[in-house]
């Protein structure tokens, strides 16, 4: 199944009218949803995809016959269960390198597995909770879970996320930036020193990847941030391809994984704000990650081999 047609549902996140209808029919037929998984089938060059962030995949549904004698729970119970199980499922999806554009679709499975586990979910008025409302809750908790991952990022990057959500790469007032910096335990001057912020004439803005210095060396960066890692990787990937990006990943070592995690959060922000160009860059980096990682490992092994040969040669002489 491949569908992406969002509908804004004020106060309860974003739902998908196509999924509402389809899942309701599956459940009515007596099935429960136990999983969803994206399979790369959709063509980026099809007419409806030109100029848009279309799904990269169709979605495989894993279904089982529902237990009609299952328990009845309340909406509050469902929220508690989703907050317990969905974060674990999200980590699994990210580790499997699901494309950010497919993340919301992939999360439907674990969320609906909880919803269809029970005979009924009752709202505050004692009425059955609809599939539409269940999907809204799943999307809401997915957003909350991604926001909670911000705790893995450094203070400068948390500031950049908050600023980017409001202004993107556009200019904003220095005073607003300074107030936000205090809340994030950093400073505008420090952010400028970090190398990704420009401050001039009472205005500040985050530098675009193409504006970042081409001679950047993470090993010499005294204020290395997750934000810099992501955007330098995008710069290198777009200008030099996967091979050059792999060289940078090899330099970053284990820190690179946190940069990949940040891409998911940034993609979600861009999609919500309808910033298609930026969203495309974050999605492309994650989709290229397996090949970049493979090339980085190959480069590391080659360097180790060369070092061993050099050492043996020195011993011989």
Q: What spans do the regions from the language model cover?
A:
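Flexible, glycine-/basic-rich loop-and-beta segments that form/coincide
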Residues: 46-98
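Generic structural hydrophobic/aromatic packing signal, biased to beta-strands
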Residues: 33, 59-63, 111
